[in-house]
Curated annotation (Swiss-Prot):
The gene is galK. This is Galactokinase. GO terms for biological process: galactose metabolic process. Belongs to the GHMP kinase family. GalK subfamily. Catalyzes the transfer of the gamma-phosphate of ATP to D-galactose to form alpha-D-galactose-1-phosphate (Gal-1-P). Gene3D superfamilies: 3.30.230.10, GHMP kinase, C-terminal domain (3.30.70.890). Pathway: Carbohydrate metabolism; galactose metabolism. Its EC number is 2.7.1.6. Mg(2+) binds at S130, E162. It comes from Salmonella gallinarum (strain 287/91 / NCTC 13346). It catalyses: alpha-D-galactose + ATP = alpha-D-galactose 1-phosphate + ADP + H(+). One of its GO terms (molecular function) is ATP binding. Substrate binds at E34, H35, T36, D37, Y223. GO terms for cellular component: cytosol.
Length: 382
């Protein structure tokens, strides 16, 4: 039974009438462009075929009733006519409530909804299960009540809910790719303008995500420190963001910067250039060049941005040794653990899976989790 069938069956069973719509919003993986988003730079994510699915129907009153199928059918119920506040014990409820509260501030022309939610985006793997939930909930209200909101506005609404209601600082990439993703394509996103260009993925290439299942604590504080170092770099060049600094300008004065700040700046500037070039390499089907750019990205994250860990570097080395120049692999996500992403010809996937299974646990004492994904369509009816 797939997620659509599961949520529709549960909807009829619990609410006693059939759902009118089923909406999905996908998770994502970022192929290249790491820690560039909050520097107003470029990212190149694709939506993946793991998603949040919501079966729903409009109500004729002002009540929102929500069932979380993945949390033992926990229930949340709130009124659109009372101030929406955080739930004291159900964290998942706050993503739903936050999206609805911020939607009210954007366009209040909607009434109550019944919904049943289920998803298969792995949680805590950096594949954006929360953004997928936020975008799915926003799309439910937009579709049921024909709200004049486009994908970018639904994405921004989700980001606001996560930043201001849930209280988690995030860029816009995760919500934007979930809302705007295109089947068989990646999306080159300009994080300053929110402009997005679809980039076709070469045929016969698998998107492989491998979770190292290693996570260092203090990730939040490390993230903030790196962000501050980038802002210090932008101030040095008297620019609003590192997006506005050229590599030439940086190289001319790099020795005058604090050495650590200089390394952080060099990563962001070189990563932005790599990301734009990667989009054109993918478009041309040049997997070899894409692989080189992913390798350079990983080395830059390891040596200049200093956000990789030995477990992640080991995983990258195992995959690289197996695929040679026939694809690419790098750490993806915030850093200090998490996942690697690889672009691999489909016929090489079994060899990569076998090599990782044989070597990673032996070298690190941790068992990996392996996902093979397809670039998928963004949010909408399913």
């Amino acid at each position: 039974m797939n997620l659509k069938e599961k949520t529709r069956a549960l909807f009829a069973e619990i609410f006693g009438y059939p759902a009118t719509h089923t909406i999905q919003a996908p998770g994502r993986v970022n192929l290249i462009g790491e820690h560039t988003d909050y520097n107003d730079g470029f990212v190149l994510p694709c939506a993946i075929d793991y998603q949040t699915v919501i079966s729903c129907a409009p109500r004729d009153d002002r009540t929102v009733r929500v069932i979380a199928a993945d949390y033992d059918n926990q229930v949340d119920e709130f009124s659109l006519d009372a101030p929406i506040v955080t739930h004291d014990s159900q964290q998942w409820s706050n993503y739903v409530r936050g999206v609805v509260k911020h939607l009210q501030q954007r366009n209040n022309a909607f009434g109550g909804v019944d919904m049943v939610i289920s998803g298969n985006v792995p949680q805590g793997a950096g594949l954006s299960s929360s953004a997928s939930l936020e975008v799915a909930v926003g799309t439910v209200f937009q579709q049921l009540y024909h709200l004049p909101l486009d994908g970018a506005q639904i994405a921004l609404n989700g980001q606001e809910a996560e930043n201001q209601f849930v209280g988690c600082n995030c860029g816009i990439m995760d919500q934007l790719i979930s809302a705007l993703g295109k089947k068989d394509h990646a999306l080159l996103i300009d994080c300053r303008t929110l402009g997005a260009k679809a980039v076709s993925m070469p045929k016969g290439v698998a998107v492989v995500i491998i979770n190292s299942n290693f996570k260092r604590t203090l990730v939040g504080s490390e993230y903030n420190t790196h962000r501050e170092q980038c802002e210090t770099g932008a101030r040095f060049f008297q620019q609003p963001a590192l997006r506005d600094v050229s590599l030439e300008a940086f190289n001319a004065v790099a020795s005058e910067l604090d050495p650590v700040v200089a390394k952080r700046v060099r990563h962001v500037l070189s990563e932005n250039a790599r990301t734009v070039e990667a989009a054109s390499a993918l478009e041309k089907g040049d997997l070899q060049r894409m692989g080189q750019l992913m390798a350079e990205s990983h080395a830059s994250m390891r040596d200049d941005f200093e956000i990789t860990v030995p477990q992640i570097d080991t995983l990258v080395d195992i995959v690289k040794a197996t695929i040679g120049d026939q694809g690419g692999v790098r750490m993806t996500g915030g850093g200090f653990g998490g996942c690697v992403v690889a672009l691999i010809p489909e016929d090489l996937v079994p060899a990569v899976q076998q090599a990782v299974a044989q070597q990673y646990e032996a070298k690190t004492g941790i068992k990996e989790t392996f996902y093979v994904c397809k670039p998928s369509q963004g949010a909408g009816q399913c």
